[in-house]
UniProtKB/Swiss-Prot annotation:
Signal peptide (residue range): none
One cellular component term from this protein's GO annotations in UniProt: cytosolic large ribosomal subunit
Protein name: Large ribosomal subunit protein uL18
UniProt cross-references to CDD domains, sorted A to Z: Ribosomal_L18_L5e
PANTHER family: LARGE RIBOSOMAL SUBUNIT PROTEIN UL18, RIBOSOMAL PROTEIN L5-RELATED
Key words of the record: Ribonucleoprotein, Ribosomal protein, RNA-binding, rRNA-binding
One Pfam assignment: Ribosomal_L5e
Length: 193
């Protein structure tokens, strides 16, 4: 008979690739609420979470679909939508008196200019205090959708490709070239809530 175990089975959520427990422990020991930002193909979800023994508690949340209700006509999974979702979350959090947090990026790799850091920048601009390095956040031009505008202008020469690429924008009545102005309009609307 064996005297000791040679193989230790990892926790279920680690096996499923959902949780990095070492990182989670470090975040929980900070004692601050966690800004959890998650991106899917078509949406951005941002939540301010607090630890509880029975399970994490959502203090404040924002979803990119809330932007549509406010009049946003762009795609809900791009960088401008991520920034606006973070701004909306930050505005809600500051109103609730939650001004301090720490970023929980989950299992996402820390890539410069990623949507998760656009959410972080939005929360910072709303007045939250979250430690981060400025070099990881995307340029202002990418956050407001100027890169989408430039691509649309480039693609405009081929009318068929332009209509295929930006069909949803055109369907909603927004020219992709007007995205930065539309972004600024919605940003002002969120800040004046």
């Amino acid at each position: 008979m064996a005297q000791n175990a040679k193989h230790r089975v990892p926790f279920r959520r680690r096996r499923e690739g959902k949780t990095d427990f070492r990182q989670r422990l470090g975040l929980l020991l900070s004692g601050k609420p966690r800004l959890v930002a998650r991106k899917s193909l078509n949406n951005i979800i941002a939540q301010l979470m607090a630890y509880d023994e029975k399970g994490d508690i959502v203090l404040v949340s924002a979803h990119s679909r809330e932007l549509v209700k406010m009049g946003y006509k762009g795609h809900c999974g791009n960088l401008p939508a991520a920034y606006l979702t973070g701004l909306l979350l930050g505005k809600k959090a500051v109103e609730e008196g939650l001004e301090e947090a720490i970023l929980d990026k989950g299992l996402h790799r820390a890539t410069k200019g990623a949507a998760i850091f656009a959410v972080l920048k939005g929360a910072l601009d709303a007045g939250m205090d979250i430690p981060c390095g400025e070099e990881i956040i995307a340029d202002e031009e990418r956050l407001n959708g100027t890169h989408i505008k430039q691509y649309a202008e480039l693609l405009k020469e081929d009318e068929e490709a332009y209509k295929k690429q930006f069909s949803k924008y055109l369907e909603k009545g927004l020219n992709p070239e007007d995205l930065p102005e539309h972004f600024e309009e919605l940003k002002g609307k969120i800040l004046n809530l």
